Amino acid sequence: MYQPDFPPVPFRLGLYPVVDSVQWIERLLDAGVRTLQLRIKDRRDEEVEADVVAAIALGRRYNARLFINDYWRLAIKHQAYGVHLGQEDLQATDLNAIRAAGLRLGVSTHDDMEIDVALAARPSYIALGHVFPTQTKQMPSAPQGLEQLARHVERLADYPTVAIGGISLARAPAVIATGVGSIAVVSAITQAADWRLATAQLLEIAGVGDE
């Protein structure tokens, strides 16, 4: 049963781009996307705070679900919609502070053991990856593939789930067919020849998410 220890999110979050700049956040919100993540890596809090503030303000303006990757203190300080954490960040993060601030929490997983760890934290949603080989980041684990993804989705039947990792426009329909509630994409949009067209096509496949 879906009983998160953090504020809930819609069962289907729809298309979920993960981007590294405020410029991309603004473009995608203007294009109709309503679930996004700002992921800026390996910088100090003071170096990213202005971007976090600007992204959160844009999210509010568009009534969108904006998650901040990793920088949970800034997300709390500026009241983001939510925070997304990798497995490696869970132990170093004050989950009680995130919960007390009323922020949603998403957690990355790569196998059954990590799903168990995520479930113990009772987050708002669980991300399942990486589905396919990806060039976006170095991954210590092997790609899950569609069959494994479907098995995880079945196990987490009443939990909001997000598939991530190597999901292209061509692969997106098969990913959605597993029953997963959302697809997170990076290069499928940011490296597309026509990002507006790619975004529109992905929205047709994955939707904007439930209200």
Curated annotation (Swiss-Prot):
Which residues are recorded as binding Mg(2+)?
Answer: 70, 89
Q: Which GO terms describe its cellular component?
A: cytoplasm
Q: Tell me the pathway.
A: Cofactor biosynthesis; thiamine diphosphate biosynthesis; thiamine phosphate from 4-amino-2-methyl-5-diphosphomethylpyrimidine and 4-methyl-5-(2-phosphoethyl)-thiazole: step 1/1
Keywords assigned: Magnesium, Metal-binding, Thiamine biosynthesis, Transferase
The EC number(s) this enzyme carries: 2.5.1.3
Q: Which InterPro entries has this protein been placed in?
A: Aldolase_TIM (IPR013785), ThiamineP_synth_sf (IPR036206), ThiamineP_synth_TenI (IPR022998), TMP_synthase (IPR034291)
What's this chain's function?
Condenses 4-methyl-5-(beta-hydroxyethyl)thiazole monophosphate (THZ-P) and 2-methyl-4-amino-5-hydroxymethyl pyrimidine pyrophosphate (HMP-PP) to form thiamine monophosphate (TMP).
Record-stated family: Belongs to the thiamine-phosphate synthase family.
Q: List the PANTHER family.
A: THIAMINE-PHOSPHATE PYROPHOSPHORYLASE, THIAMINE-PHOSPHATE SYNTHASE
The name this protein carries in UniProt is Thiamine-phosphate synthase
Please report the organism this UniProt entry assigns to the protein: Shigella boydii serotype 18 (strain CDC 3083-94 / BS512)
Taxonomic lineage: Bacteria, Pseudomonadati, Pseudomonadota, Gammaproteobacteria, Enterobacterales
> Could you tell me the gene encoding this protein?
thiE
